[in-house]
Amino acid sequence: MDKLSTKHFAFFILGSSLIAIKSYSSVFINLGGRDTYLLFAISALIFSFVFLSFLKICKSNLDIKEIFLSLNLFGKILLYIFTFGFFIISVESASTLSSSIHSNFFLSTPIWYCLIFFLIASGYVLNKNFNSILILVLITVFSTLIGDIILFILIGKYLNFSHLLPIMKGGFTTNKWIAIILMIGSLSSMCISLPYLKFLSSKKGLIKYSSMAMTICFIIIFSSLISTIAFLGPIRSGNIFYPEFVQSQRIQIANFLEFGELFYIFKTVCMWFIKYILASYSIILLFKDIITNKKIFIIIYSSIVFIVSWYITQNQYYFFQWLKILQLCLLITLLITPLLGFTIYNF
């Protein structure tokens, strides 16, 4: 049976939100400078309050679709806007992974080639049942967490924490406020876990384990931002497409063993893949009464994602400007939209 425990749900939270800010951290560091990690802490606190409010409301009805539809026509409109956010995440996942692989590993391989391999593999997984996806999420997220811990330990000796000083020089500038807004938008991807609440076998411990997952996620991202700035400095880390890859290249043991890229590529491929699966499968869950043929839907959906992803990744500078726009879109579709709907539903 398709059942989910609250402990398992914690892995869905991690899988949906752990990778984005870490992957293209230069987008945020370019705006927030050496204080980006502190700005992230503010973003995390704001988002935590909203997301936990969502979970408390969902405890009365675990089916998020029913919550939206209870608002009649207005609720249907909000549901479609909310679902569009899942499509945005699918595009973000496919394009960022393909761009990262192309830029860091296979420069001579075109991005469309990477996209095809990614979408074929994801299409195969999406055609499976929920239990298969659950197992994949649990194994992948757990393995990635272990890899992140090992990578952070290995990179510790290369960090120069003087790059983090002075703290909050110049106060809160316009760019820093923009960085906070964009990071809240990025964290909004955590909301793709909400459609999976309907699979919970029990509500017991939902807030507890979800809070633990969010705390782990925030600590890892917070540590990643600190290590990136301490390793490269605020100026350089804000002007490199994928700073974590540069960090991983520096790892060396006994002047002989170099394997940091292995951690990076494993984490990047696995977590973006999981995020894409969670977002795409959420759409299938929400509209399973409309989707009569799952295979045809996956083919059409993957084709649309391919076209949009290929278009926005034609140029890296162009793509990283698109990423800022995508964060704002996620903020509107995945945070503000359900916040509006849940507020009306609750009152």
Give the ranges of each region predicted by the language model.
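Hydrophobic alpha-helical segments and their helix-loop junctions in multi-pass secondary transporters
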Residues: 4, 87-90, 94, 126, ...
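Hydrophobic, membrane-embedded alpha-helices of multi-pass small-molecule transporters
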Residues: 5-24, 39-43, 47-50, 82-86, ...
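Membrane helical hairpin/interfacial module
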Residues: 21-111
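Membrane-water interface regions at transmembrane-helix termini and the short interhelical loops
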Residues: 30, 102, 118-140, 199-202, ...
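Small-residue-rich segments of transmembrane alpha-helices in multi-pass membrane proteins
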Residues: 72-83, 139-155, 216-223, 304, ...
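Membrane-interface loop-to-helix entry segments
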Residues: 112-113, 125-155, 323-339
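Membrane-interface interhelical connector segments
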Residues: 231-260
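Extracellular/periplasmic helix-loop-helix junctions in multi-pass membrane proteins
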Residues: 291-298, 309-332
